[in-house]
A protein has these predicted regions:
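Extended, charged alpha-beta segments that form solvent-exposed binding/catalytic grooves
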Residues: 2-23, 30, 34-190
């Protein structure tokens, strides 16, 4: 192997991947432990899903997935988002469980080499978002984080595109100038 390439493999990590050591590793563990403590106090149970999934393409663009073949050469992907797997597992495999509040603290991966740690929670069978807001607020307060809440729903851009006869790519590509350029009186008043 070329000596320069060997040095890269010995010392560098791929762009987008994470390396924690010393103080940063300690801080990461403290954040995870405090978040888990607050979630458990609020009656959430922890779930750790497999790193690999057959279902990621249902919620993530295929080009963002890191894909492989399983034993039967069926496509699987590294987990790129925890929500879909947690909800799928909780509603299918754990449907008879009394637990309806789940949390997870685990890494997710996106193509080509992006790695982030996700702390998340899901409440099944409750349409109120207030329990979620309360728990998130408590976690943020614990870490001295002040935040503004933005509630989004994929149906909003879809409905706007339908009403204005626009392609969804306007939102996917962040091209709000297209909507503003329509010079709609009701929108101009906003």
């Amino acid at each position: 192997m070329n000596l320069d390439i060997q040095k890269i493999y010995e010392h560098d990590i791929p762009d987008g991947s994470k390396l924690y050591f010393g103080a940063s590793a300690k801080l990461k563990r403290e954040i995870e432990a405090k978040a888990a403590e607050i979630l458990e106090k609020n009656e959430f149970s922890e779930i750790i899903t497999p790193y690999f999934s057959h279902h990621q393409r249902q919620s993530v663009k295929p080009e963002s997935l890191i894909r492989f073949g399983d034993k039967q050469n069926l496509e699987i992907a590294l987990r790129s988002d925890s929500t879909i797997d947690v909800v799928r597992i909780a509603t299918k495999r754990l449907k008879d469980s009394d637990t309806k509040r789940w949390f997870y603290i685990q890494p997710v991966f996106k193509h080509p080499t992006s790695e982030i740690y996700q702390i998340g929670a899901e409440i099944l069978g409750d349409s109120s978002i207030m329990p979620c807001i309360d728990v998130v607020s408590e976690i943020f307060r614990e870490f001295g984080i002040s935040a503004h809440l933005q509630i989004s729903n994929i149906q909003i851009p879809k409905i706007i595109c339908q009403l204005l006869n626009l392609p969804i790519s306007v939102f996917e590509n962040g091209r709000l100038e297209v909507i503003l350029g329509l010079n709609l009186p009701w929108l101009n008043r906003l």
